[in-house]
Amino acid sequence: MGKAKAPRRLADNEARAVLRTIRISPQKLNLVAALIRGKKVATALSDLEFSAKRISGTVKKTLESAIANAENNHDLDVDALVVAEAYVGKSIVMKRFHARGRGRASRIEKPFSHLTIVVREVEEKGEAA
């Protein structure tokens, strides 16, 4: 008995990877996500490899996870994958206290983010035999 299996939210030619609670602000993470949005996965991986942003290594790992999910779980062709979506969401915000002069205190906020990457298999254009 039990509950029926939920329908798949993505199309049959898509796979995704989600990384939650990353210790970086969503605004900074979105700069790196925008760098790979809409690109082929090989180009996106090389862009992340040589990016100077601190978080680019973490985003690269998540993209590699999405590629592995596409290959192993959904039998998609790795060479025909593009980054269909790369979006960032807000997570928790840790609040910390910072002692200031004259006995006062101020608040330091340490934001966290969520990252979702969706890769899609596209057919190559111009391969008419």
UniProtKB/Swiss-Prot annotation:
Gene Ontology process terms (BP): translation
Keywords, alphabetical: Ribonucleoprotein, Ribosomal protein, RNA-binding, rRNA-binding
One Gene Ontology MF term: structural constituent of ribosome
Alphabetized PROSITE patterns for the sequence: RIBOSOMAL_L22
Record-linked SUPFAM superfamilies: Ribosomal protein L22 (SSF54843)
Pfam families xrefs: Ribosomal_L22 (PF00237)
Gene3D superfamilies with a match to the protein in the record: Ribosomal protein L22/L17 (3.90.470.10)
InterPro entries: Ribosomal_uL22, Ribosomal_uL22_bac/chlpt-type, Ribosomal_uL22_bac/org-type, Ribosomal_uL22_CS, Ribosomal_uL22_sf
GO cellular component: cytosolic large ribosomal subunit
NCBIfam families (alphabetical): rplV_bact
Subunit composition and interactions: Part of the 50S ribosomal subunit.
Family per similarity comment: Belongs to the universal ribosomal protein uL22 family.
Function field: This protein binds specifically to 23S rRNA; its binding is stimulated by other ribosomal proteins, e.g. L4, L17, and L20. It is important during the early stages of 50S assembly. It makes multiple contacts with different domains of the 23S rRNA in the assembled 50S subunit and ribosome.
This protein's name: Large ribosomal subunit protein uL22
Gene name, Swiss-Prot/TrEMBL: rplV
